[in-house]
Amino acid sequence: MEYSKEDLMEAKKQIWGVGENMGTEESKKIWEENAQFWDNAMGDESNEFHREVVRPKVTELLSPNPADYILDIACGNGNYSSYLAQRGASVVAFDYSKKMIELAKRRQSQYAKQIEFCVADATDRKSILELKRNRAFTKAVSNMAIMDITDIEPLLMAVYELLQESGIFVFATQHPCFVTLTEKYMTPHSYYDIAIEGQPKEQIYYHRSIQDIFNLCFRAGFVIDGFYEECFKTNKEIPMVMIVRLMSACSLCHLQYTL
């Protein structure tokens, strides 16, 4: 089932009690308060969950190389940006938390020639498009942030515009089937929870079904050409994360035509 933009907006109003960008400011305030704790907890190499569950398959699907110009979405303290820089890529990394970007610049200062850190709002298409530089991005990546973003449609639309025709977008997010234990799986809704024990403030999570996420990807012009469901430690049959690779539908058509 595919929802129109009006359907999704009405669902947001009914479940979240908000308009198009409401909720973003509250979420931003929370992340401003959590920024220093998050930077300390994630450090230079990220935490065990990211290192073992998220990063391996994200990197496999992204396949970063020295020729790449990569957009790192909701970059946090920039530890994955530096991981990409270590592999020779040039990176533009952004987050909506000014404090987080300050910490990222400080922590990743040795990669200043390869990484440009910016403050931008992932729910604001215009804000993202202002990250356009002299060349198109070859790739885009988002590690465990889709579920923290109030409205992902502007992000998907903007990323599609910023990528070169053969570009790819890889994102990892909570698996909506197994992390959000709810009787209202099909209904978009938000809730408060923590990501790391001890963080100062509970963050806001935005639950979307797989079909809602994928249909927004398709509507933006993407197709899916890579997908993983990843488990953590002893939960070998319960995937906590899904990792998706998107590419332009036009690029796929061109590829099929040339074959």
Per-region residue spans from a language model:
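Conserved class I S-adenosyl-L-methionine
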Residues: 3-65, 79, 83, 103, 169-196, ...
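A short glycine-rich, Lys/Arg-flanked "PGG" loop and its adjoining helix->strand segment in the class I
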Residues: 153-168
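Acceptor-substrate binding/catalytic loop of class I
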Residues: 173, 196-211
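A short acidic, Gly/Pro-enriched loop at the edge of an enzyme's catalytic core
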Residues: 128-140
